[in-house]
A protein has these predicted regions:
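Acidic, low-complexity intrinsically disordered tails
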Residues: 7-12, 703-745, 846-937, 945
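Short Cys/His-rich "knuckle" micro-motifs
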Residues: 944-948, 961
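Extended catalytic cores of very large enzyme megasubunits
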Residues: 1-790, 794, 803, 820-822, ...
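Hydrophobic alpha-helical membrane-spanning segments
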Residues: 686, 690, 837-845, 946
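Residue-level signature of catalytic and energy-coupling elements of molecular machines
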Residues: 749, 832, 947
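Phosphate-backbone binding interfaces of nucleic-acid-interacting proteins
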Residues: 772-857, 862-871
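Short Cys/His-rich micro-motifs in 6-15 aa windows
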Residues: 955-961
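Short cysteine-rich clusters marking metal-coordination/redox-active sites
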Residues: 935-938, 951-954
Length: 961
């Protein structure tokens, strides 16, 4: 940013130290041994391509990472967070360098500002922070990785709230401030309700423009900065109070624009969110939210009129039917997912600084809600790192980790830069922090708890309460050492009142299982202790916690799920070392099945079924009462809308801020359902809510339907169509003498024989099946079927196609088999084609369909990775993959370890053709299209993270983290 301001040095930042500094205990590290020396490091080549075009968009060779970091995580960190120009000496090349520049900056500032009791404590702080970042226990938000320790301004905050008044100077300054924040890759939100409506008069006697008119200018500015090369799409939030006279126009803005997008798309224009033609449509760069009051919601309940208030005079200038207005809000959200809703009285009832001013707005993702002209820096814990081997939650280490993280976050405010003087001043005076978590969905599944269950909600609430209670307790301790935040004295009564509300909610909570009871017990202790210390010292921070979407940083930590979200789907898309990709079953699933008491044989069968079908419905051996544990955000068994809302409500009372989360609804959801979600959100005490009905957006890739051939010569298209309508195939007959193998089998007690003949190169060319007595109907049908399959193979139909079509067909006989590789079969056809796949398809092709030998499955259960079983596979042997040495580091980096050999991954195969992300894999397996946008950098389909979208290929996000 070109304009930056550090907070003024005050007693709350740099000045006198009130008490002895912190004593830092070791959690994970060993005295006398640096964390880097405890792990194995390897060098990798990071090459990133645009998946759709094949263009190489990034390449850096010989980068250094711990061997347990995934390819995806290392790619994202290398492309997003390594500083310096690629190919230059100042370019970072190791994760060590990235962590060191951040951690050493924090440690130096902590010593300078009096946070530590001794140099030894500072060293322990440095080592523990390094260990946790290296082991993906937590991560700071993206601006920390972008800026800290570099020559750039030390911006650490991802979330900003601005303000605008009813003057032209203020409105034009809003455009400028927002633009500077977007330039730095962050997001901002503000409330436009102070601006006079288009129904009011100016002092000169003319009619006011109204806030919706000024939104056009801000939207165009954001779109221009995005097009000018910002690190990601501009993230912005626009809020309008429900009593504003222009509220109906505000609600309908995006609905009208979606109609335009639909018309332009059907005419053949490129209306993807990154498309060249989308810029002609307005209001596409912001999330819109309506701020509703309790007064309005009660009018809605009672079917009463509600007054719209003039901004200048404060008089009611129009009355509307509250039910009709709320219905219009739900209809707009049904049509285009905007606007969301924010509950004003609930937000301000939990406000710790009421004497300073009201909370009027939020950041773009809606998790940070605080004073105007303020900011918040975020960090998120990876909850799966606290799941112990015995299945319990590691309360002790979670508390210690939270203490350390919240301390480091507060230290960052001491040296941080800000985009405006007003934001710098407010942040220095109130020191808002936003600690949160990711991987909740994975933790619940691994613990055998359904996301939409009392047990799941209880554990989520307990962890949230423990996190926030510990953070505020440490904040109170810091206040005794380096002083309370400057605004505390003015707001002492209000802050203490909110602390007691959190405490009361924690004590009122009831444990549901032994898993959450220990967490609740510790949370109660933390709140009790924190309030006792806070009433003596005050608190260092006005806010401590939020639940952010954790888009990019969630991928950096190798999280299966983001923020508070459930798992997207049970089958994922995984990048492999050296290139290529494969389809894998979520690694949490085998762990969950074992915890539920299933035998290894059944675990293997269920995992194999999920790999092929993408869901657990009718999985062999899985009890129906366990189905809900594996429910996901999308798919055959998706979590209900109210399941999402109730999970948010379970956590909301234990957060300083709010929750970035979108409530997903199926495409056939009604307006009434959305109306119910918005109403129940208010009743359950949420602060904000957004909904997303599948396929409600039409700004998506132009691939099918009208306009797909825009610009194509009609004669050429017709000729191509005619050619494709009459394909010419040549039959490749088998030689007179050919190798074959006969397999005897039994499925559900029914026996049969299969003879498979091959070409000289080992490729399958014919199949003969012997079932039933000679002359029987069954025998005749199977003979005819064998001939059809054999002729298809000889005319070039891929075996993969037959396997995909015939495996998992269900009919009798079905059940146990006598084949160790295929323990359960849904039918004879299911067994036959899975056996053919194991015998005649290369490993890469069958692994993409989730088909493995018994040896391969056992190895995966032991090591977490599928590798080919060369001894049992009889498929044609392809050329062995090359072993590649990554280039040596430059001489100036002589301290780096020797390069390890990385085996190149198999090439992409037919089964993963057309798939570049987990979202696209879900679409292929389910047959359901998503309208998620394509990533503007690498071309793959993004997935939802909170109320934003994130690209799991390169880490780009439309949000703040």
């Amino acid at each position: 940013m070109s304009i930056v301001n550090k907070p003024a040095a005050t007693s709350a930042t740099k000045g006198k130290v009130l008490g002895k500094g912190l004593t830092i205990d070791r959690i994970y590290t060993t005295a006398g041994k640096h964390p880097y020396d405890e792990v194995t490091w390897e060098r990798r080549d990071v090459v990133q391509t645009n998946w759709k075009s094949g263009e190489v968009i990034f390449e850096q060779k010989g980068v250094e990472y711990p061997d347990f970091w995934s390819v995806n995580a290392s790619t994202i960190v290398t492309t997003k967070y390594f500083r310096g120009a690629v190919g230059q000496e100042n370019r970072e090349w190791s994760l060590k360098q990235v962590i060191d520049r951040v951690v050493l900056t924090y440690t130096k500032a902590g010593k300078e500002y009096g946070y530590f009791a001794s140099d030894t404590d500072a060293e322990v702080f440095e080592h523990e922070l390094t260990w946790m970042l290296m082991h993906q226990v937590f991560s700071f938000n993206s601006p920390v990785w972008f800026n800290v320790g570099t020559t750039a301004p030390q911006q650490v905050s991802a979330c900003f709230i601005l303000s605008v008044d009813d003057t032209m100077d203020s409105i034009l300054n809003w455009y400028r401030e927002e633009g500077m924040i977007f330039k730095g890759g962050s997001g901002a939100g503000l409330n436009l309700s102070r601006i006079r409506s288009a129904k009011e008069l100016l002092k000169s006697g003319g009619t006011a423009s109204g806030p919706v008119s000024f939104m056009r200018g801000a939207d165009a500015s954001a779109g221009t900065i995005k097009s000018g090369g910002a690190t990601r799409r501009a993230a912005k939030m626009v809020v309008l109070d429900v009593d504003h006279p222009d509220i109906e126009e505000f609600i309908e803005t995006k609905v009208r624009e979606e109609d335009k997008i639909r018309a332009l798309r059907d005419a053949g224009f490129d209306m993807d969110l990154g498309g060249k033609d989308i810029i002609s449509v307005q209001y596409q760069n912001a999330n819109n939210s309506v701020r509703v009051s309790d007064k309005f919601m009660k009018a809605y309940e009672n079917g009463e009129q509600f007054g719209l208030v003039a901004r200048a005079s404060g008089e009611v200038i129009e009355s509307v039917d509250a039910k009709a207005l709320f219905r219009k809000l739900a209809e707009a959200a049904w049509a285009c997912a905007d606007p969301g809703i924010q509950y004003d009285d609930t937000i301000n009832d939990w406000h710790t600084n009421p004497e300073t001013g009201r909370i009027n707005a939020s950041n773009p993702c809606s998790e940070y809600m605080s004073l105007d002209n303020s900011s918040c820096n975020l960090a998120s814990l990876n909850l799966m790192k606290f799941l112990k081997a015995d299945g319990s939650f590691d309360v002790k280490n979670f508390v210690k980790a939270t203490e350390l993280i919240i301390t480091s976050m507060d230290i960052s405010i001491c040296f941080a830069d800000f985009p405006t003087e007003a934001i710098g001043r407010t942040t220095a005076d109130y020191r808002q922090l936003g600690i949160g978590f990711a991987n909740l969905g994975a933790l619940l599944m691994a613990s055998g708890l359904a996301y939409d269950s009392d047990g799941g909600r209880a554990l989520a609430g307990a962890i949230t309460s423990l996190m926030t209670g510990t953070s505020y307790r440490r904040s109170a301790e810091l206040a005794g050492i380096v002083g309370a935040y400057n605004g505390f004295a003015r707001n002492a009564a209000g802050h203490t009142r909110v602390m007691r509300k959190h405490q009361a909610a924690t004590h009122a909570a009831k444990a549901q299982t032994t898993l959450d009871s220990d967490v609740w017990s510790e949370a109660k202790k933390e709140w009790d202790k924190g309030i006792e210390i806070g009433e003596k010292n005050g608190w260092r921070n006005a806010q401590a916690s939020v639940l952010a979407p954790t888009g990019t940083i969630g991928l950096m930590m190798d999280c299966d799920t983001t923020g508070i979200e459930p798992d997207l789907a049970l089958v994922k898309f995984k990048k492999l070392v050296g290139g290529g990709s494969m389809q894998i079953v979520n690694q949490t699933i085998p762990m969950t099945l074992r915890k539920l008491g299933y035998a290894e044989e059944t675990v293997e069968a269920i995992v194999e079924y999920i790999a092929a079908n993408g869901n657990v419905v009718d999985a062999p051996g899985l009890k129906t009462e366990h189905y809900d544990i594996f429910d996901c955000a999308m798919g055959a068994r998706s979590i209900s809308a109210m399941g999402h809302v109730k999970m948010m409500a379970a956590c909301q009372s234990f957060l300083s801020g709010a929750i970035s989360k979108t409530v997903n609804l199926p495409a056939d959801a009604s307006v009434e359902e959305i109306e119910e979600v918005y109403y129940e959100g208010w009743k359950l005490g949420l602060k904000a809510l957004a909904v997303y009905r599948d396929n409600c957006k039409v700004g998506q890739p132009l691939s099918e339907g009208k306009g797909a051939n825009k610009g194509t010569d009609s004669n050429t298209a017709a000729a191509d169509s005619a050619d494709s309508a009459h394909p010419v195939a040549t039959r490749k007959r088998l030689p007179k003498s050919r190798p074959s193998r006969t397999t005897s089998f039994s499925v559900g007690g029914a026996e049969g024989y299969m003879t498979a003949g091959t070409y000289a190169d080992g490729a399958l060319g014919e199949v003969f099946l012997k079932l039933g007595k000679q002359g029987s109907t069954l025998a005749g049908v199977m003979d005819a079927f064998s001939i059809a399959i054999s002729i298809g193979l000889q005319y070039g139909v891929p075996l993969e196609t037959f396997v995909e079509k015939f495996s998992n067909l269900r009919f009798e006989p079905a059940g146990m088999t006598d084949d160790a590789d295929i323990r359960m079969a849904q039918s004879m056809m299911d067994y036959i084609f899975r056996r053919l796949a194991l015998d005649y398809l290369p490993y890469e092709s069958r692994s993409a369909m989730g088909l493995y030998t018994a040896t391969e499955r056992q190895r995966a259960l032991d090591t977490g990775e599928y590798t080919p079983d060369e001894n049992t596979s009889t498929a044609p042997v392809a050329a062995a993959p090359k072993v590649v040495d990554t280039p040596k580091a430059p001489a100036a980096r002589a301290a780096a370890p020797a390069a390890v050999k990385i085996e190149a991954a198999p090439a992409a195969n037919n089964s993963t053709a057309g798939v570049g992300s987990s979202m696209e894999l879900f679409e292929k397996m389910s047959g359901v299209k998503s309208d998620a946008p394509l990533c503007m950098t690498c071309g793959v389909k993004m997935r939802m993270a909170g109320s934003c979208f994130v690209c799991e290929g390169c880490g780009n996000t439309s949000g703040c983290s």
